[in-house]
């Protein structure tokens, strides 16, 4: 699902805005590196781990919505950190060299929907390792964001 959304995004500009992938994430299929779908999945699993920790074990409709909202918010927070680094590193390029606000809105909506869907499929679990990986990703991109870049 995540890879399909990225392919649609690259081909149409919807829902994130107009962007193209560089070659640093590996080979492309339909102008999109398959690795990006895996990165989405890893990030989603980590954000879901933390949302479960913070919201709790309740399985009520309200708790499920809260967990999905926290997951989506964590995903967007990571994307806010990741975007400037990824564009500077040549992972992808935005049309007009600016990150459109609709990118962050789309990330939130998609992550919210995926988090809700994920929790309906009980065979798909997230765990502490996913949560740790999320923190490592965040620390990695924060570190890179704070470093000076040569133009």
Outline where the language-model segments fall:
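Aromatic-rich, lipid-facing transmembrane alpha helices and their immediate juxtamembrane interface loops
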Residues: 1-151
């Amino acid at each position: 699902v995540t890879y399909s959304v990225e392919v649609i995004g690259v081909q149409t500009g919807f829902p994130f805005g107009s962007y193209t992938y560089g070659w640093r994430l590996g080979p492309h299929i339909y102008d999109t590196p398959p690795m990006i779908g895996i990165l989405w999945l890893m990030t989603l699993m980590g954000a879901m781990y933390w949302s479960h920790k913070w919201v709790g074990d309740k399985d009520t409709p309200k708790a499920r919505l809260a967990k999905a909202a926290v997951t989506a918010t964590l995903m967007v927070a990571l994307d806010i950190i990741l975007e400037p680094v990824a564009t500077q590193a040549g992972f992808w390029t935005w049309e007009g060299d600016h990150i459109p606000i609709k990118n962050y809105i789309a990330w939130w909506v998609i992550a919210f929907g995926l988090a809700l869907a994920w929790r309906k499929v009980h065979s798909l679990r997230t765990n502490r390792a996913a949560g740790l990986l999320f923190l490592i990703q965040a620390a990695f991109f924060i570190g890179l964001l704070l470093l000076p870049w040569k133009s």
